[in-house]
Amino acid sequence: MSQRVRRNGSPTPAGALAGGAVGPPGGPGSRLQPMRATVPFQLKQQQQHGSPTRGGGGGGNNGGNGGASGPSGGGGSGGPRTASRSTSPTRGGGGSAAARTSPTVATQTGASVTSTRGTSPTRGTAPGARSSPPRPQPPPPLLGTVSSPSSSPTHLWPSEVIAAPPSARVRHRRRSPEQGRPSAEKRSPSAPVCKAGDKTHPPSSSSSSIIRRTSSLDTLAAPYLAGHWPRDIRGQAAPCMRDKATQTESAWAEEYEKKKGSHKRSSSWGSTEQLKEIAKLRQQLQRSKHSSRHHRDKERQSPFHGNHAAINQSQAPAPKSTLVPAGPITKSSGSRFRNSVEGLNQEIEIIIKETGEKEEQLIPQDIPDGHRAPPPLAQRSSSTRSIDTQTPGGADKGSNNSSRSQSVSPTSFLTISNEGSEESPCSADDLLADPRDKENGNNSPLPKYATSPKPNNSYMFKREPPEGCERVKVFEECSPKQLHEIPAFYCPDKNKVNFIPKSGSAFCLVSILKPLLPTPDLTLKGSGHSLTVTTGMTTTLLQPISMASLSTNTEQERVSRGTSTVLPSASLHAPPEPIEEAEG
């Protein structure tokens, strides 16, 4: 860098180059800009480019420019700072002081030092500044320290700066040539002009962002810091504020409303707000877990639940005190913290099981209707009879024939619930069931639609026939018909099983006409590629056969097969002579 600056011919351009190095947040910095997300690169660049020049530059030659740029930010202001350094030797000391003051100064000092080498005696201090940049790297707070130099200055002492010079120099030299070319060309005419050029041209993309960042370095530094330090700081302060609030419903409700509103806005806010909310939620969940697990007794005796604890002997209030914080936590924290909430729910269930019968009596009062199932009916069912308890009782005590019909039919429920004795409904069901079985349910329309059959077939599944339809007895439909009633035509013939047509025709003479054929006379005449049976057959049956066109070979095959199968099946004793084959 320093050599190129010297070539340009003015120490101030060298300073400008140093500024360019400072600008590297601007000039080459623009190329490195995407890396700013990672703290170490930013720390290296800004520390190397900006530190001593800021302290000295602001107070020294640059005067207003350097001073303004020094506080504002390492990137844009670096250019003027370095220029001021190169002009006066005092900046060497100023640079070291600046390095002490702000970490970003260290980054600028490296660049400015290189530029100042050619121009002014400050090199001695400048090298110290150069050496400083490597150590400024460790302090990620650079961004944060830009606003407050006191935090990181310890990293940049002149002695330390001097110790590390070679690495810093190498880094600056590597980065500087890129920076130096545009910066030297643009900055060479004069230092102030070069400063403007540095900010505008090479850093245009990065320097503009740098300027924006410098204006709001506090807000920008916060996200980096929020990732590490501020969470702990905020977390430490928050629990002290909220330990008291966790004990009361009102405080929880207020916090929940605040959180709810903040979450709605957090998407548009900066990442710092989101991080704050997350940290708060974590702390609250941890407190709620800790308090619910380790401080249940304290919560039960808390002032808000004091009355309940005194009345209920700290049985009912325990679940209540845990339920109150659970609601807002689940809604505000979202799915991210479900595990902890589930843990709370499990603990509540354990508490409810431990409390026992007293808990059962008290909980329905505490919990609004619709949130809990009704208490079991075990006590009432023993003394009074209800529909729920009738099916087992009736089946056990009733007669075998009518017990299930009682439990099934609605009339049995009515009679059992209204009448104290169990025998009277049984007799009533018997009266209903017997004629119903005999007359297929004509007398009793209501019990016809029973839901379960009886093993003794006293009641069958039945349904009223639709209007205009005849009632048919079930037994007639279900009873299998005897073989003698079925006509022989429908019966399968054993001889048919062996018959397998190969022609692929759907109409088979033998299989269809076999039972109807007369015994002696069967003549198959093949004329014009068609088969016709002359005796005992109606034309309607033979039409499909005559329609099929067959080759003589297939006809012969069919005839031979037909005779072989028909003769035994129809018990034809005549030889196959009467069959005549006429080929047309």
Curated annotation (Swiss-Prot):
Biased composition (Polar residues): 145-154, 379-392
Annotated Low complexity bias: 80-90, 114-132, 204-214, 399-412
Amino acid composition bias (Basic and acidic residues), ranges on this chain: 350-361
Residue numbers spanned by region Disordered: 1-214, 227-461, 551-584
UniProt superkingdom: Eukaryota
PANTHER family: AGAP011572-PA, PROTEIN FAM117B
Gene: Fam117b
Listed Basic residues bias regions: 287-297
Protein species of origin: Mus musculus (Mouse)
Keyword Nucleotide-binding appears in the UniProt entry: no
Compositional bias annotation for Pro residues: 133-142
Phosphoprotein as UniProt keyword: yes
Keywords on record: Phosphoprotein
Residues modified to Phosphoserine: 10, 102, 206, 215-216, 268, 340, 386, 444, 452
Pfam families: FAM117
Name the record gives this protein: Protein FAM117B
Residue ranges, compositional bias (Gly residues): 53-79
